[in-house]
C-alpha cells in the first residue's frame, strides 16, 4: 500500500519473489527498523572514525535522523527527535476472484505532517484543537 518509489519497488519485488506473496505491514515495519538501525550505525561510525558504535553513540545518531524506507521517508521528529513519523495510507479491500486474493483499492495517501501533531504538541490536544498546523496535500 506504500507509494511507488525505487526503494518500495525493490522491497516489494524481492519480498514477493522470496515468499510468493506480497509484503504486508509487519514486513514493512521490520524493514523500516533495520534500515533505520543501518542509517544510525553508519552515521555514528562516520562520526567516531569507523569504530563499532556504543549504545550512546547510536542513540545520538538516531536522534533527529531521517531515512528512506519501502514505506516512505521516516523522520525522527517528535519527542525531541526520539519518535518517528511517516506517511500513511488508507484503503478498502476487495476480493479479486481471478487471483483468488484480497486486493487493496481506493488507496489514499497522507503526508506524515498531515496525520501527526507538530513537535511539542500532544496528539489528543492537537485533535481536540482541530489539528492546527496539519500539512495536508
Q: Which sequence ranges carry the predicted segments?
A:
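Extracytosolic ligand-binding ectodomains
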Residues: 1-137
Amino acid at each position: 500500500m506504500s507509494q511507488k518509489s525505487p526503494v518500495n519497488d525493490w522491497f516489494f519485488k524481492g519480498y514477493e519473489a522470496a515468499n510468493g506473496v506480497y509484503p504486508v505491514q509487519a514486513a514493512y515495519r521490520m524493514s523500516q527498523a533495520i534500515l533505520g538501525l543501518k542509517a544510525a550505525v553508519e552515521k555514528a561510525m562516520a562520526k567516531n572514525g569507523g569504530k563499532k558504535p556504543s549504545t550512546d553513540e547510536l542513540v545520538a545518531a538516531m536522534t533527529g535522523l531521517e531515512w528512506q524506507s519501502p514505506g516512505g521517508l521516516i523522520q525522527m521528529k517528535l519527542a525531541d527527535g526520539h519518535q518517528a513519523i511517516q506517511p500513511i495510507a488508507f484503503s478498502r479491500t476487495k476480493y479479486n476472484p481471478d487471483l483468488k486474493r484480497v486486493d487493496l483499492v481506493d488507496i489514499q495517501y497522507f503526508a506524515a505532517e498531515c496525520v501527526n501533531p507538530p513537535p511539542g504538541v500532544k496528539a489528543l490536544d492537537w485533535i481536540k484543537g482541530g489539528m492546527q498546523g496539519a500539512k495536508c496535500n
